[in-house]
Amino acid sequence: MNNFLKHNDWARDPAFNHFWRHYDFSNQWIKQHTDASRQVQMQMVQRDNLSTEQCFSDSEEPEVIERLSRCEIYSEIENEESDIEEMSEEMKAFFAKTQEHRQKLKEQRAAEKRKEGQSSSKSQEEYVNVDKISIRGRIEQSTDHRNASAEFIAKREKAKKDYGESATKILAMESTLAMKFESEYSQNPQLWPNIPFRF
């Protein structure tokens, strides 16, 4: 395993630490499981005073044969040297590309955070009492020039996209409702409370 890490720089990247911890944990589990299986087998053999071959060849249980074959496989794996084959060029390119994408995404998120920080510091809103807020909401003072025709065109395009053919009807109903509100509001109605409290 150490040879593999020596020859592959990408594998030592901190992004893969979780993977290597999991890999080590899995190897430890396999070794412990193999040791426990061997101990159980040895106890069975000693108890019956038979060799392992006789013990398992006499039994006709397929489970026992399967367990023995698994234990042999684990012991073979354990006995072999832990030299892992070199990675193919495609795999190396894949990991390099993945790391590059992660780095770009990290930089993009950092830039967005910086941008949000700058915009929030610019637009520190002042506290406004409720009685100072008009019926149309809070009107913010801005030095930016408002392009009403561009806003109207954008609103119309959005309505076409959202409502399809009936977009013109819906925009007309919105305009009618806004005009009725303005005509009522121009008469200075009592806004609150609109019903008398008589207890």
UniProtKB/Swiss-Prot annotation:
Annotated coiled-coil segments of the chain: 72-116
GO cellular component term of the entry, any: SMN complex
Positions of region (Disordered): 98-127
GO annotation (BP), single: spliceosomal snRNP assembly
Stretch forming the signal peptide: none
Record field: compositional bias (Basic and acidic residues): 98-117
Keywords: Coiled coil
Keyword Hydrolase among UniProt keywords: no
Protein name: Uncharacterized protein F10E9.5
